[in-house]
């Protein structure tokens, strides 16, 4: 593995989980101007009613397979149970090597550690706090965790560094 010095003079890898990475070289060392990934999405897209009968129907419709990147929004923060609920259902279906790309994980998501150790989750790209952060720090994951801030996650998705296969968000049923 090739190593290079970052802005603090520390040796860091030039590759993580099989992808080339650049070290942080200081606040203004990279002028940006990166590429945007994908085409534009109309502001008033008419996708029709995407509401399904229940979470199982939504998971079926997504055709989730081993190795896919699963994303979650964290607006409920430590009161969020959607991540746990979805991951319980994906684990029960026997899925493996999933990449979690949440905005953030909190202590309420601590039970995901069992899915890290069993191989349901191969690694996480997002902010990891509490028991999940501890599991990452102790090397429990199959691959390296990638710590991303909320804004860093946005940039990674926009620039094509992080491709999301399926995203879950709590919505309100429209009756």
PLM segments and residue spans:
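Conserved alpha/beta enzyme-core scaffold
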Residues: 2-174
């Amino acid at each position: 593995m090739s190593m290079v010095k970052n802005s603090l003079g520390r040796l860091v890898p030039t590759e993580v989980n099989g992808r080339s990475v650049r070290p942080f070289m200081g606040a203004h060392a990279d002028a940006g101007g990166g590429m945007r990934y994908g085409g534009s999405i109309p502001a008033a897209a008419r996708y029709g009613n995407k509401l399904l009968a229940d979470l199982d129907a939504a998971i079926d419709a997504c055709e989730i397979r081993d190795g896919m990147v699963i994303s979650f929004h964290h607006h409920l923060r430590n009161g969020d149970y959607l991540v746990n609920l979805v991951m319980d259902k994906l684990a029960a279906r026997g899925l493996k090597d999933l990449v979690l790309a949440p905005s953030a994980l909190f202590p309420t998501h601590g039970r995901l550690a069992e899915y890290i150790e069993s191989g349901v989750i191969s690694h996480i790209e997002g902010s990891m706090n509490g028991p999940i952060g501890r599991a990452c720090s102790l090397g429990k994951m199959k691959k390296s965790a990638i710590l991303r801030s909320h804004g860093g996650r946005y940039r990674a998705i926009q620039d094509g560094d992080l491709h999301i296969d399926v995203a879950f968000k709590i919505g309100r049923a429209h009756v």
